[in-house]
Amino acid sequence: MRQSREELIKRGVLKEIFDKDGELSIPNEEGALENGQPLGSGQVLSSSQVSLPALAELESGSAPGEPCSYEVLPTTEITDGTVSEESPTSNESGVLLSQDPTAKPVLLLPPKKSAAFPGDHEDTPVKQLSLLKQPPALPPKPIARIASHLTDPGAPVKLPCMPVKLSPPLPPKKVMICMPLGGPDLSSLSSYSTQKSSQQPLTQHHHTVLPSQLAAHQHQLQYGSHSQHLPSGSSTLPIHPSGCRMIEELNKTLAMTMQRLESSGLHTGDNVTKTGPGGLPDMRQVPTVVIECDDNKENVPHEADYEDSSCLYPRQEEEEEEDEDEDNSLFTSSLAMKVCRKDSLAIKLSNRPSKRELEEKNILPMQTDEERLELRQQIGTKLTRRLSQRPTAEELEQRNILKPRNEQEEQEEKREIKRRLTRKLSQRPTVEELRERKILIRFSDYVEVADAQDYDRRADKPWTRLTAADKAAIRKELNEFKSSEMEVHELSRHLTRFHRP
């Protein structure tokens, strides 16, 4: 069931924008290519050529039951000129879905120079343009066949959709779709894609977009303004990003989603059978979005990376399980660790080689007793040589390190020292002088001080000449004196010391 253009415009799928004078204008992009060749600067397509009859031919050319295909304008319209339409909000070119849910996306070449022509029909929808690009360095793709058909001014050329497989992904079609910031809102696009997928009878060649992927595309449309890709109901086209950093991130996410889909069992082969809303099994394929950057193609991963990624994740899970087992085994007590350390040290010490083993392995040199004696003699000769090199006393005297000595000078030095000492002793003060100066304050008063004659104490030693009998008589006399004549207190008599007889 087709819907009219007015209903689609009301729903927000199509936009109809007019200038003040009723003219339709589209922002142009410089360097527009037609299969790699630049367009002429004077080629302009009038609005009368892109009118309701041309659109009717495009709609009638594709039946709803036919396989998915891309439709290109006839060469008469392409070579004569291009349609230009300018939006009051933004000058960026965008993607506009076709006016019919069963119609196929129409790919229009962007013009080289912007031109505005009065539109005869006010109800003509805004056909915003996309770019067909084919770099010469890459191998020929299915879109490369457009060049041969564009020369024929016949019916519009149809390109069948290539079935997309998950591993390895097919080489991408060189079609770039630029999405403006102020383009159609996401809700209208999602509703359009779901409506088209539910209304069309799907065949093997059709592949729709899953709701999870549609949500992912909406998230990328919200947060990634430079790298934006729009999933349509019949095909998914690669997008040309402005930066190569986004390419690497999107390729990583694609590889992860492919692996998760394979591991979850959603894909048993190239196609997946699911029951539709009417109970009929519909064959669907999850499309693969491959993004290529022509400025820097070295960052794009190879197809072998996608094939090898399937065998990486089970190995990583096994390694993680082994690491967890090792971590659990290491949770032992500190006492056990100490015991292990002591045991390991004891084992290492017991395994130390002996001196003989080291000598056999030539680690330690073999030494006999004679060799040891020779080494000691060599060390002794070195020491004696060093000691013999010490300077003599005469050399030290010559260097004024040692002073020369004479016997007469030494005796005179000794005499001078004695004179100093006697002078100091003769100048000592008496006890009375010390009391007057209050130096001997603690000196006891009951001590009687008597002047004695000066004599040499060392000269007179009578006790050295006493015999044993004289000593015995002296001891006997002392004992008798202490026992009879000396006054002793009765309580301290036992403390009296008597000499042995």
Swiss-Prot record:
PROSITE patterns: RPEL. Residues 21-46, 295-329, 382-415 are annotated as: Disordered. It is found in: Cytoplasm; Synapse; Nucleus. Residues 295-304, 392-415 have a biased composition (Basic and acidic residues). Keywords: Actin-binding, Cytoplasm, Nucleus, Protein phosphatase inhibitor, Repeat, Synapse. Residues 36-46 have a biased composition (Low complexity). Its main location: cytoplasm. GO terms for biological process: actin cytoskeleton organization; actomyosin structure organization; cell motility; stress fiber assembly. Binds three actin monomers via the three C-terminal RPEL repeats. This is Phosphatase and actin regulator 1.
